[in-house]
Amino acid sequence: MSSKKSSLAALTLGAIGVVYGDIGTSVLYAIKEVFGSGHVPFTPGNIYGILSIFFWTLTVIVSIKYVVLVLRADNNGEGGLIAMLALASTAVKDKPKLRRILLIVGVFGTSLFYGDGVITPAISVLSAVEGLEVVSPAFKEGVIPITLVILFCLFALQKHGTAGIGRYFGPITLIWFVVIALLGISQIVTNPAILKAISPHYALLFMWHNPGTTFIILGAVVLCVTGAEALYADLGHFGKRPIRLAWFSVVMPSLVLNYFGQGALLLNNPAAVKNPFYLMAPEWALLPLVGLATMATVIASQAMITGAFSVTKQAVQMGYLPRLNIQHTSVKDTGQIYITFVNWSLFVAIVLAVVMFRSSSNLAAAYGIAVTLDMLITTTLTFFVIRYSWNYPLSLCIAATGVFFLVDLAFFASNLMKLFAGGWFPLLIGGAVFTLMMTWKEGRGLLNDKLRSDAIDLPSFLDAVFVSPPARVEGTAVFLTAEPGTVPNAMLHNLKHNKVLHQQNLFVTVRYHEVPWIGMNKRLEIESLGHDCWQVTVHYGFKNDLDLPKALQQIKGRGCELESMTTSYFLSRDTVVPTIGRGMASWREKLFAQMHHNASGAADFLNLPNNSVVELGSKIEI
């Protein structure tokens, strides 16, 4: 029992560090943006109303929607938009039109994650460093350079992995939550009546008397739920119970105390609106608080970067992105990965965001549209999971998700007002990623259709070949083929140029499925084709690590003896040639051809030994 408790405590501490870093640092800027906008006069009724809106936003969106409802929609224990997309699309596989719509919506939501992934580290680190301006105005000119240096160091460290320092994320973030709670309490004791704002009637009164202002400030209120998606995205790492326990026991109480403390400070000193978070602290504590805030925002940014790597890997394995060079940075933890292209693309985009917007207040204008649209998409997919995967009655599905849909829609509509003030930036990034993902998916479909139409039936081909068999050489040849039962181009080229066949020949097709994990007991299917030839199908989930040589070891004892020293892997390196008048638009075909050209080779992707790989090229028109 004690070991279970210690395991739960460790997972809960880990969840505090990874899952809640982003939402935990929103106290740095959320209240400041609502009152600093000038839309809300400093009256006790308005301050009570805003705090009440904050409290009930956290309660409805995070506590009820994500912690209670969405966490239930796991895909074999995994969470995140891709996992939910796989769950929803599988549930409606007998409705092809609806399935395609859901796939497009889900892919768009996944694309928006990258836009969010640019804004979050930029606004978090920048808002922490801006605390130096409270220490001394002389630091103002150094805020952006210091922010850029911190971000560069963060991204430069990624290739070395974070397993070593990752164990400190939970304790540091826990200290952060304790500190922000104490800061809030220090102000609440000066005006305990501020706690009355927990009552929803203050929020309702404010909205009733200020409908126009309410609509406008929702664009800033949404900042208090930044990172809510992480609760679901990190489900597979920690599990439901630790995530829920961390939220209700530590995170939400600390956030509420801090927000209410900032409200109490503003009641006593409206001038503190320039930076209410830091001005809650005594002067002697400012520099240590800036240091702690910077560490907390770096941890929050790290969680976002790690999430970007994980989402990219899943998208690659589900066929929405080309193969990328994925490096494992930890021997013990297979989830610790590094993708060079994603890392430095994110860094460049974040630097652009910091340099273009120059302050956390300006970045707050860019934040919101992508996040609220993502929340809308999550609610929509949740509806289809409840309806078609859980088979609940339609009325219950509407009741369960309808309120959340309306709340998300209100936040999204409010944030649309920030479109030209900066909201376009994450949308532009998300739109670009969406274009790449859909172009790759459709391009691969066209390419596979072309390969299928030109394919030669493998059993018939082998029968013809062995009428007058070529010379056999020792060892095993592994030919990769997109479709089982078809002759791979690499084999045709090998016979044409080398005029030999190996003693054993494996025709291997790798299948990716819309489930997170497929166990080793279901990894392999093997079928004898005669003449010491076998058709092998290897199955992977979208979170499995790919290692084809390891998977093929299961063949031993099933009629084929595989020795790594005498095994050669024959791959076809196809060059895509765009043509006019078929398939996609011309510019998309050219884009797909370029993506295909730049894709990482199958050898690296499938972890094949470099000294055993033979690549043979061919051209394919689409």
UniProtKB/Swiss-Prot annotation:
<keyword id="KW-0406">Ion transport</keyword>
<keyword id="KW-1133">Transmembrane helix</keyword>
<feature type="transmembrane region" description="Helical">
    <location>
        <begin position="366"/>
        <end position="386"/>
    </location>
</feature>
<keyword id="KW-0997">Cell inner membrane</keyword>
<dbReference type="InterPro" id="IPR023051">
    <property type="entry name" value="Kup"/>
</dbReference>
<feature type="transmembrane region" description="Helical">
    <location>
        <begin position="137"/>
        <end position="157"/>
    </location>
</feature>
<comment type="similarity">
    <text>Belongs to the HAK/KUP transporter (TC 2.A.72) family.</text>
</comment>
<feature type="transmembrane region" description="Helical">
    <location>
        <begin position="169"/>
        <end position="189"/>
    </location>
</feature>
<keyword id="KW-0633">Potassium transport</keyword>
<feature type="transmembrane region" description="Helical">
    <location>
        <begin position="247"/>
        <end position="267"/>
    </location>
</feature>
<feature type="transmembrane region" description="Helical">
    <location>
        <begin position="279"/>
        <end position="299"/>
    </location>
</feature>
<dbReference type="GO" id="GO:0015293">
    <property type="term" value="F:symporter activity"/>
</dbReference>
<feature type="transmembrane region" description="Helical">
    <location>
        <begin position="393"/>
        <end position="413"/>
    </location>
</feature>
<protein>
    <recommendedName>
        <fullName>Probable potassium transport system protein Kup 2</fullName>
    </recommendedName>
</protein>
<keyword id="KW-0813">Transport</keyword>
<keyword id="KW-0812">Transmembrane</keyword>
<keyword id="KW-0630">Potassium</keyword>
<dbReference type="GO" id="GO:0015079">
    <property type="term" value="F:potassium ion transmembrane transporter activity"/>
</dbReference>
<dbReference type="InterPro" id="IPR053952">
    <property type="entry name" value="K_trans_C"/>
</dbReference>
<comment type="function">
    <text>Transport of potassium into the cell. Likely operates as a K(+):H(+) symporter.</text>
</comment>
<dbReference type="InterPro" id="IPR003855">
    <property type="entry name" value="K+_transporter"/>
</dbReference>
<keyword id="KW-0769">Symport</keyword>
<feature type="transmembrane region" description="Helical">
    <location>
        <begin position="50"/>
        <end position="70"/>
    </location>
</feature>
<keyword id="KW-0472">Membrane</keyword>
<feature type="transmembrane region" description="Helical">
    <location>
        <begin position="337"/>
        <end position="357"/>
    </location>
</feature>
<feature type="transmembrane region" description="Helical">
    <location>
        <begin position="419"/>
        <end position="439"/>
    </location>
</feature>
<feature type="transmembrane region" description="Helical">
    <location>
        <begin position="101"/>
        <end position="121"/>
    </location>
</feature>
<keyword id="KW-1003">Cell membrane</keyword>
<feature type="transmembrane region" description="Helical">
    <location>
        <begin position="8"/>
        <end position="28"/>
    </location>
</feature>
<feature type="transmembrane region" description="Helical">
    <location>
        <begin position="203"/>
        <end position="223"/>
    </location>
</feature>
<dbReference type="Pfam" id="PF02705">
    <property type="entry name" value="K_trans"/>
</dbReference>
<dbReference type="GO" id="GO:0005886">
    <property type="term" value="C:plasma membrane"/>
</dbReference>
<dbReference type="InterPro" id="IPR053951">
    <property type="entry name" value="K_trans_N"/>
</dbReference>
<dbReference type="Pfam" id="PF22776">
    <property type="entry name" value="K_trans_C"/>
</dbReference>
